[in-house]
């Protein structure tokens, strides 16, 4: 399927192997497709957060600099997430995996097929997403706030259950390091 982002075939030893062309004698292929959502921006991408800061925080600072650290104590971020209604993906993850000599595409099948052979990939994948979430969103805004005399507070999405945290940020606790006033959303 030419529209597939990654194509895999079953392999007795490895579980699955990514292929880029049809394989003789193979009739069953497992395809992974890449879909995007207009409802979400890629906050794992540092360029996206830089643009967000430039278009919001920098504008506030340009207009209200004299209030920063006084009347304007800080910024509140509400439920940042990489996307909670589908399996998350960012091209930035591919770059991060390449730094270790791996391809994220080679393991994507393990986000959908549960087998012990895929555990290491799933763990590395979600740890990578969480690190990108913390470094490229929370830390960037936290550092900007600190440099401009104000504080950062807010909360992530789905703090109430560990499994649900995988949907939005892979874990919420690491982000608290980069909030002056960490918060959670408890609605009942």
Would you name each region that the model predicts?
Residues 1-123, 128-132:
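Mature extracytoplasmic enzyme cores
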Residues 55-63, 132, 136, 140-144, ...:
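Generic, well-ordered alpha-helical scaffold segments in large soluble proteins
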Residues 72-80, 125, 129-167:
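Aromatic-lined carbohydrate-recognition surfaces of secreted/lumenal glycan-active proteins
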Residues 80-94, 153-188:
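Substrate-binding cleft/loops of secretory-pathway carbohydrate-active enzymes
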């Amino acid at each position: 399927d030419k529209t597939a982002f990654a194509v895999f075939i079953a392999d007795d030893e490895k579980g699955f192997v990514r292929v880029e062309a049809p394989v003789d004698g193979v009739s069953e292929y497992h395809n992974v497709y890449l879909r995007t959502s207009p409802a979400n921006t890629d906050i794992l991408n540092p360029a996206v957060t830089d643009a967000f800061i430039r278009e919001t925080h920098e504008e506030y600072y340009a207009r209200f600099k004299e209030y920063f650290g006084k009347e304007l104590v800080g910024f509140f971020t509400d439920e940042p997430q990489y996307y909670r209604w589908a399996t998350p993906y960012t091209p930035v993850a591919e770059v991060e995996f390449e730094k270790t000599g791996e391809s994220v595409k080679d393991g994507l099948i393990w986000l959908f097929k549960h087998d012990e052979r895929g555990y290491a990939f799933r763990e590395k994948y979600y740890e990578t997403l969480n690190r990108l979430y913390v470094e490229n969103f929370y830390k960037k805004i936290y550092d900007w706030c600190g440099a401009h005399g104000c504080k950062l507070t807010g909360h992530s999405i789905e703090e109430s259950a560990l499994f649900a945290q995988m949907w939005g940020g892979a874990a919420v606790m690491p982000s608290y390091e980069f909030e002056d006033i960490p918060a959670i959303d408890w609605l009942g």
